[in-house]
Amino acid sequence: GPTYEVLLRSGWHPGGDIEVEVIPGITSLSACASLVGAPLTHDFCSISLSDLLTPWPVIAQRLAAAARGDFVLALYSPRSGRRTQHLVEAQRILLRHRQAETPVAIVKSAYREGQAVHLTHLGALAEAQLGMLSTVLIGNASTYVQDGLMVTPRGYAQKYDAITGDPRSGERAGRSLSLGLEGWQAAIREQIGHLQGGSLAAL
């Protein structure tokens, strides 16, 4: 990011005198997730708690939005020697929208010397031992821990019978859920039709 910012502001263009190569790699959150199971199977987002370059109100807004949206969260830079209250405040924001029992994984130095993995829950997050080398994975409403593995279901159980594999009542294989976009719109239209005056304002 900073490399491109400096180059572009200095008048550099792709194909110019300075060659830039971006080599893809494994992100910290992916490495950490692989050590605890499959917590990122469904939608997720990453948020840094460092306010060295980002105002805290922006960080807080992102935390609240992610929690309301039921995203699995990966928190970077959760705590440092000087930033001791940021994780406490983040926990407070998240608990407005998540149960205290929500599974949490804390991974330190994934695949490096000093690696450590700790499973806990959101209600105990602020008391956990962690620092700048730690990444925090916070589950969504469906995430669970079983036999030491943190798993976020992809959602197949909502659509298919776990034993037979057949679509559940009202669902069709290869089609959107009954409450996918089209189904949801149809349900809203039906509700509006039943309301007096049939207007959205009545909703």
Predicted regions located by residue number:
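Class I SAM-dependent methyltransferase SAM-binding "motif I" and its flanking Rossmann-like core
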Residues: 1-69
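A contiguous loop/helix-start segment that scaffolds small-molecule binding in enzyme catalytic cores
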Residues: 6, 68-183
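Charged, amphipathic alpha-helical regulatory modules used
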Residues: 187-188
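Mobile late-domain/C-terminal helix-loop "cap" segments
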Residues: 192
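Short acidic, hydrophobic short linear motifs in intrinsically disordered regions
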Residues: 197-203
